[in-house]
Amino acid sequence: MNPASDGGTSESIFDLDYASWGIRSTLMVAGFVFYLGVFVVCHQLSSSLNATYRSLVAREKVFWDLAATRAVFGVQSTAAGLWALLGDPVLHADKARGQQNWCWFHITTATGFFCFENVAVHLSNLIFRTFDLFLVIHHLFAFLGFLGCLVNLQAGHYLAMTTLLLEMSTPFTCVSWMLLKAGWSESLFWKLNQWLMIHMFHCRMVLTYHMWWVCFWHWDGLVSSLYLPHLTLFLVGLALLTLIINPYWTHKKTQQLLNPVDWNFAQPEAKSRPEGNGQLLRKKRP
């Protein structure tokens, strides 16, 4: 199947020759550079304008900038995923093999983002000697999965777009963590955002069940359009997300609503500075 037309728009950012590897690889690089730019701009603006950011240690600043970058990507992914899930007739006509030019744009730029994300996470882990297993697995599977879609002109776009919709929680996660660091964990706004974020994580779980349903009813189309390693990677990743990662993150975010602490950093810092005023620091942290 050749990359499909997006319904007749003659001059559009989506109206490119996506059968060309040069176009697809260029957009992937553009996605990497764009989100690297978001990361750098966030650092510059936060350093200039935000007192909370200036008070953070280096590792927390990196996490802040990554959270903001993920939030921007989350907005892009949510818009694209919702349209694929609810509105695009071509994708709904063939959920296994249907393609759209606008989907090619999001797949290529998302591949660039996940490449950036993997580089950033691994560099951060190397520099700060940390390791988040679930996050590493999540983004490795995401990058390899979207890279598989990018190189395979036969791959359908519906499941790729609904996978992007799983990023619906990232803007709320970003807001939650930034407000937590700013000491706003008792505010009504933080609690409302936390409720919405938990709801988004539950929606993610429901969405994974829908994706399994699509796989079951369109199995023959998936087998004929995806390479076996790519299909295996997708199914293993979806299983990990459904059975382990989504439930774990939903549990942790619910815990955080009831006990608003920064579980990304509080425990390691407490261990690294156990003497003196370590207990006082733990109490001060939101």
UniProtKB/Swiss-Prot annotation:
Q: Which GO terms describe its molecular function?
A: ceramide binding
Describe the PTM. Answer: Does not seem to be N-glycosylated.
Is-annotated flag, keyword Transmembrane helix? yes
State the UniProt keywords alphabetically: Disease variant, Endoplasmic reticulum, Epilepsy, Intellectual disability, Membrane, Neurodegeneration, Neuronal ceroid lipofuscinosis, Transmembrane, Transmembrane helix
Quote the SMART domains the UniProt record gives: TLC
Q: How does it sit in the membrane?
A: Multi-pass membrane protein
Does Membrane appear among the keywords? yes
* One Pfam family hit: TRAM_LAG1_CLN8
The transmembrane segments are 21-41, 62-84, 103-123, 131-151, 226-246
Q: Where is this motif: ER-retrieval signal?
A: 283-286
Please state where this protein is localized: Endoplasmic reticulum membrane; Endoplasmic reticulum-Golgi intermediate compartment membrane; Endoplasmic reticulum
| Entry's Gene Ontology cellular component terms | endoplasmic reticulum; endoplasmic reticulum membrane; endoplasmic reticulum-Golgi intermediate compartment; endoplasmic reticulum-Golgi intermediate compartment membrane; membrane; mitochondrion; presynapse
Effect on the protein of changing residue 207 to R: In CLN8; uncertain significance
Task: Return the InterPro entries for the record.
Answer: TLC-dom, TLCD
Q: Which residues form the TLC domain?
A: 62-262
Q: Which BP terms does GO give this entry?
A: adult walking behavior; associative learning; ceramide biosynthetic process; ceramide metabolic process; cholesterol metabolic process; glutamate reuptake; lipid biosynthetic process; lipid homeostasis
Instruction: Note the PANTHER family from the entry.
Output: CT120 PROTEIN, PROTEIN CLN8
Q: What does this protein do?
A: Could play a role in cell proliferation during neuronal differentiation and in protection against cell death.
Query: How would you summarize the oligomeric state and partners of this protein?
Result: Interacts with CLN5. Interacts with CLN3.
Disease field reads:
Ceroid lipofuscinosis, neuronal, 8: A form of neuronal ceroid lipofuscinosis with onset in childhood. Neuronal ceroid lipofuscinoses are progressive neurodegenerative, lysosomal storage diseases characterized by intracellular accumulation of autofluorescent liposomal material, and clinically by seizures, dementia, visual loss, and/or cerebral atrophy. The lipopigment patterns observed most often in neuronal ceroid lipofuscinosis type 8 comprise mixed combinations of granular, curvilinear, and fingerprint profiles.
* Protein name from the UniProt record: Protein CLN8
Organism phylogeny: Eukaryota, Metazoa, Chordata, Craniata, Vertebrata
Annotated gene? CLN8
